[in-house]
Amino acid sequence: MQPVFYKYTSTKEYHDAFPCAYRQWRADSHCNLIHGYSFSMKFYFGTNDLDVRNWAADYGGLKELKKTLEDQFDHTLIVAQDDPQMETFKLLQERNMAKIVVLPKLGCEGLSDMLYKYVNGVYIPEMWGPGEAARLWCYRVEVRETQANMAFREGHREWNEDLFA
């Protein structure tokens, strides 16, 4: 895949904005225990053409994205959909001890991939419309656990990826 460069880039960052807990149940280390972070997330929007306001991306138009992120990550216990302890986690939720969010992949890599696909495949087309979806691409999504640990998902429309796979 060839790198793609955009003439303009705008970023939106949510710094230490989403306190949540999860575990990597497949890990051989202490990461298989429930532990928490206050996630930071950063979105890179690229375009070669500014809109009529001379903007790459409309920051005010990201309010619904922030709400979606809060619903998924703010004071939640994120559980992998194949976690063998799923019934235990469900019991915690039934007893009002946790707000469970079940996701297909965890870790910064999995979360950044999920968010990359959501922003490009759902959010921009549905919230901003097909014209903006044709003009603008969120080409990088970073998910940060701590100052030392971050992973990102990068891609470009020109790569013709299936965003729903």
Regions found by a protein language model. Name each.
Residues 1-165:
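Charge-rich, low-complexity N-terminal segments
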